[in-house]
Design a protein with these regions (language model features):
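Exposed aromatic-hydrophobic patches
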Residues: 139-145, 173-175
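N-terminal export/assembly leaders
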Residues: 15-97, 127-131, 192-198, 232-243
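Bacterial Sec-dependent N-terminal signal peptides
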Residues: 1-26, 34-38, 119, 151, ...
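Extracytoplasmic beta-strand/coil segments of soluble accessory domains associated
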Residues: 218-252, 270
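Short, acidic Ser/Thr/Gly-rich low-complexity loop/linker segments typical of extracellular
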Residues: 125-140
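Short, acidic, small-residue-rich periplasmic hinge/interaction motif at the N-terminus
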Residues: 35, 41-42, 79, 85-99, ...
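Short Pro-Gly-centered beta-turn/loop motif in secreted/extracellular proteins
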Residues: 112-114, 142-150, 166, 212, ...
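Short acidic/polar hinge/loop motifs at secondary-structure boundaries
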Residues: 142-144, 249-278
Length: 278
């Protein structure tokens, strides 16, 4: 049986590479500090950003011999932050200009970080979607939010979904409990990580899921970190419309709708999620 690879990307500006390489382990440092550290290790680029705009976003990632643009891509991750390049200047800005943010940390009962959990902010009045984000390698998340109060939905494969009301600001730690039974009876095998970070993308290993025979690709995508599927079927990632590739070929909107409905989950070998392509 032919198997497919789905590749989703959020819009991003193509960047030329530099001979300079960055190697560093970032452990729970602010985005502002991470960018300053990268800038200190390059003589080619000046990195421009508004300090207070990015200070609340925290970075936990390891960078090994990356170009300056690629290093910045890694520290940005799936935050709603955009990078553009103009000659020797790199501009980094948050694309969601809200005065308040929802800040927190997702952990298990042993205190270990839960990586790539989906966090959705819903209206406290009617549960409509406001904004969303993904926990990073330290289990932490920062989501710009215009609402002072919101319902916070936290979900991750293998854990019980949490739905609680919070005020905007730092809500502290959210503890999730394990639950091998997930939507529609799908079971996670648990032998290998179902999500894996490679270069500038997240690999969603469909082979680590059982009982998916009756699911479509659309059903499985609902498990993917940072992916939101609107009621009209539009796929968004990191707050932006996602471009969908199947085995390297970009799908039109019409093809995308057909694939999401007709392509069975069992026909997919893996899903790749990225904020850039090429």
């Amino acid at each position: 049986m032919k198997r497919y690879i789905l590749f989703l990307i959020a819009s991003f500006v193509a960047i030329s590479v530099s001979a300079q390489r960055i190697t560093h382990d970032f452990r729970d440092v602010s985005m502002s500090k991470a960018l300053k550290m990268i800038e200190a290790n390059t003589s080619k680029y000046k990195i421009n950003f508004i300090y207070n705009e990015l200070e609340d976003f925290t970075v936990t990632t390891s960078i090994d011999k990356k170009t300056v643009p690629d290093a910045i891509r890694d520290v940005i991750g799936f935050y709603p932050i955009r990078m553009t390049v103009d000659g020797d200047n790199i501009f980094v800005e948050c694309i969601q200009k809200e005065n308040t943010k929802l800040i927190g940390e997702v952990i298990d009962k042993r205190g270990q970080p839960i990586v790539y959990a989906n966090i959705s902010l819903l209206s406290a009045k009617d549960s409509t979607f406001i904004n969303g984000g993904v926990s990073n390698l330290a289990g932490k998340f920062v989501i710009p939010c215009s609402a002072k109060h919101a319902l916070v939905k936290v979900s991750c494969i293998g854990y019980k979904t949490i739905l609680r009301a919070f005020d905007a600001g730092d809500i502290g730690k959210i503890i999730m409990t394990e639950d091998m039974q997930v939507i529609k009876g799908v079971i996670v095998k648990g032998h290998r990580p179902i999500f894996k970070h490679e270069e500038n993308k997240i690999i969603f290993d469909i082979n680590q899921m059982q009982k998916i025979e009756n699911l479509t690709s659309k059903d499985v995508l609902k498990f993917a970190p940072g992916v939101i599927i609107n009621s009209n079927g539009e796929i968004k990632m990191a707050g932006k419309k996602a471009t969908v590739f199947v085995n390297g070929r970009q799908l039109s909107d019409e093809e995308q709708s057909a694939f999401m409905t007709n392509l069975k989950a069992s026909e997919i070998s893996k899903i790749e999620l990225s904020q850039n392509h090429g």
